[in-house]
Amino acid sequence: MGSIGDVMSGEIVVVAPEDTLGEAAERMAEQGVGSSVVLDSGRLIGILTERDLLKAVAGRVHTSEARVREWMTSDPVTASETDSADEAIRTMLDNGFRHLPVVTAGRTVGVVSLRELMRAALQVDV
């Protein structure tokens, strides 16, 4: 199926730990993505996903006040652009993830989604 770099889209939403959940959700909706990476001084410190936002809303959290740092997954598992797509799928399934930040040479270059990986797998198998 190839590498993660062959599969992932170039779209990435970056938020800061002090951004509100509302700000993060707005950016994610504008870009049509299900996750955002949380950077602090250019360093990946977390990931915020649709699931995190749903948990906050279900808990009746005020998204205009709650901060990303309170709801993000800290120190997320990452992959490299050169990792195989099969390896990424296994990591995601084993850990219950749908989004995996992609880091190359210490720089966050994207996020690969399970949907992107499955789409690529189905195109190869057809």
What do these predicted ranges mean?
Residues 54-67, 114-126:
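A short, polar/charged loop-to-alpha-helix boundary motif
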Residues 2, 19, 48, 66, ...:
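Short beta-to-alpha loop/turn elements within the nucleotide-binding domains of ABC transporters
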Residues 28-31, 36-52, 92, 100-115:
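A glycine-centered beta-loop-beta connector
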Residues 20, 52-53, 67-71, 84, ...:
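Histidine- and aromatic-rich ligand-binding microenvironments
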Residues 2-12, 66-76:
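Bateman (tandem CBS) regulatory domains
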Residues 5, 13, 22, 54-55, ...:
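Nucleotide phosphate-binding site architecture
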Residues 14-32, 39, 79-96, 103-104, ...:
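The conserved cystathionine-beta-synthase
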